[in-house]
Regions:
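Bacterial N-terminal signal peptides
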Residues: 21-33
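Intrinsically disordered, low-complexity terminal tails/loops enriched in metal-binding residues
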Residues: 34-194
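Compositionally biased regions
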Residues: 10, 24-26, 194
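N-terminal secretory signal peptides that target proteins for export/translocation
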Residues: 1-18
Length: 194
């Protein structure tokens, strides 16, 4: 009949797409409902490999700093690590990020301080991998690292004096002297949130 509009139904292809999407949504909802246990929350991801026996850091391209999410493999001279008592190892883009995690493992590593086993850094002048508890730490020099003004690890008094002559040093401290309360005074960096 002229002037009368025929009823229009959606094309069959569109009906199939809507029907398929509804079925897929229902299947996904059922899978979530029957999944065993809670879905794990996002958090810090340990390195793909642990520290080597001599403390060497086998950093992979996928490893991310748990403090700032930068890629430690891009900064081999400044890379650092913390091994935990359960064998997990976290790699950091810089000694500063490692020190933040050492002071606040509950925030940055999702574990208590009792789980921290071995902090490792690369000594600035020699490149030697060392325990971070055995080095002198320098702040306030002219060295710039991945996160800005660097916190620099030095292995002994001779390296400290040579570094100081070349780069300056506002503060020198040991890891066991560093606390949340004196962080800003010793490092010259803003205090991490607690």
């Amino acid at each position: 009949m002229p002037g009368r509009r025929p009823e229009v139904s959606p094309p069959p292809k569109m009906l199939g797409t809507v029907h398929g999407a509804l079925c897929l949504s229902l299947v996904m909802l059922l899978l979530v409902a029957v999944a065993p246990g809670p879905v794990p929350a996002a958090g810090p991801v340990p390195g793909r490999q642990g520290l080597g026996p001599e403390g060497d850091m086998p950093i992979s391209p996928e490893d991310r700093c748990p403090v700032c999410a930068m890629l430690p493999i891009r900064y081999p001279r400044f890379a650092a690590a913390i091994a935990l008592t359960d064998g997990r190892t976290y790699y950091f883009c810089s000694p500063g990020c490692m020190l933040n995690a050492w002071l606040h493992p509950d925030i940055f590593l999702g574990c208590p301080a009792a789980d921290l086993k071995r902090p490792v850094v690369r000594e600035y002048l020699s490149g030697e991998v060392m325990d971070a508890r055995e080095v002198f730490w320098v702040s306030g020099s002219d060295v710039v690292g991945p996160m800005g003004p660097a916190l620099v690890p030095l292995k002994d008094q001779a390296h400290l004096e040579a570094f100081r002559r070349r780069h300056g040093a506002r503060k020198v401290f040991r890891l066991d002297e560093l606390t949340h309360d004196n962080w800003q005074t010793l490092t010259g960096k803003q205090r991490p949130s607690s």
